Amino acid sequence: MKVLTPAALILLFFFYTVDARTREYTSVITVPNGGHWGKWGIRQFCHSGYANGFALKVEPSQFGRDDTALNGIRLRCLDGSVIESLVGKWGTWTSFLVCPTGYLVSFSLRSEKSQGGGDDTAANNIQFRCSDEAVLVGDGLSWGRFGPWSKRCKICGLQTKVESPQGLRDDTALNNVRFFCCK
């Protein structure tokens, strides 16, 4: 039986500890109507290939109390794995919507502008266009409006911007998202 050299052990350790945050990407796609509250989570990537579906974490209307609407986005990768970045604490996950064939190539975010002294929700829903031209509209809420479509690319990762709970002040949860593109 051959004994591994220290260099071989280090390389072996490196390849087994590479995770979904370390994949190389070629570009980032964004849209101009994301909210500004919160902090960016960590980047998450499909281990290989691209994303072909998504699910949303949505808090339904609170009927006059503090609404947050969209709290999280999960991507389903072609290999069946699921990735997510930072997620808000409210709501439940919807079922996955998946491209009939192909993968996700662009997105449009539904957001509500600042309500001044009223109840802000920021991002409410998202829709994606697939490489086969199908459009998948998320099961989020209908406040605000969908903004412009992003540029097109092969989506392989995401990073979300989420506001942490504000105690007795107004909560918004998910405010913005950026998607990463791979070759």
From Swiss-Prot:
InterPro entries, A to Z: VOMI, VOMI_sf
Keywords linked to the UniProt accession: Disulfide bond, Secreted, Signal
Compartments in which it is found: Secreted
Range of residues in the leader sequence: 1-20
Major location (coarse): secreted
A Pfam family: VOMI
Listed Gene3D superfamilies: Vitelline membrane outer layer protein I (VOMI)
CC annotations in GO: extracellular space
Disulfide bond residue pairs: C46-C77, C99-C130, C153-C181, C156-C182
Similarity comment: family membership: Belongs to the VMO1 family.
Role this protein plays: Exact function not known, component of the outer membrane of the vitelline layer of the egg. Seems to be able to synthesize N-acetylchito-oligosaccharides (n=14-15) from hexasaccharides of N-acetylglucosamine in a manner similar to the transferase activity of lysozyme.
Protein name per its UniProtKB record: Vitelline membrane outer layer protein 1
Organism expressing this protein natively: Gallus gallus
